[in-house]
Amino acid sequence: MRMQPDLPPLVNPAQARDPGDTGAVADTSAARHCGPVRAAGLAPMTVVSYNIHRAVGTDRRYRPDRIAAVLEELDADIVALQEVESGSSNDHTLEYLAGHTGMHVVSGFTRVHGNADYGNALLTRFAPEAVNQIDLTVKGCEPRGAIDATVACTAAGCASPLRVIATHLGLRPGERRHQVQQLLNYVATAHPLPTILLGDVNEWFLWGRPLRWLHAYFEQTPHTATFPSRLPVFALDRIWVSPRAHLVSVASHRSPLARVASDHLPLLACFELPAAALPGAA
């Protein structure tokens, strides 16, 4: 049985950054990413996709406290995690992150890794109203899946709940084509709600059919490199939204700490969703 090391308490970003990096910690809070709301009648929201590589950083050290500190930097409303582990002990990564963020947890594990469940997860400030697991496994390939969670963002002033679909697609081109077709068919037949699809789509080919299909359905979103974290070249992590007008901006989070905490950078998107009418409003 593999034992997890004792974990340190959550540290601030300056304490947790790579000791070899002497650069200042960037001021990259969600508020600075998104700026002021553009118009009345809109509710702002920040959403992140983050492949945390089992909390093993670019220095090959298991340090979930660094992932927790990156999440503190981001201060997002919803975080989709990939390559996250969970187990019966609070020393496992997902339990550790949930304890430090205080967010609701939705797990979507696809296989067992060592003595832990392994796969996808959502951290959300909003209570989940409904959760469905989508099996995206292709025969002969690693098990894959997606979380479909409807969250009660009406608590933050939104006019309706929000559907969040979080995934991690396969490594083979044919596998990804099959998985994207499954996801798009699923979204097209689901109950209509504002929908965010996000995750590590593992798509290296910008001209490939999976990205073209996704852009055709959701409309194109910015191409932002997130991998590898030290010198990002590839936009493996993606965020789409329907309707597209809700999306304000997409950016990778490139703080010194994020560059060492995982082999992927977090991808952060800012949204403005229709706000609920105030009581007594005409």
Tell where the protein language model's regions lie, with residue ranges.
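Active-site regions of metal-assisted phosphoester/phosphodiester hydrolases
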Residues: 1-78, 89, 99-100, 104-282
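A short beta-strand-loop structural module common to alpha/beta enzyme folds
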Residues: 80-85
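Short, surface-exposed acidic-centric catalytic microdomains
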Residues: 92
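Serine-esterase "nucleophile elbow" of acetyl-processing enzymes
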Residues: 95
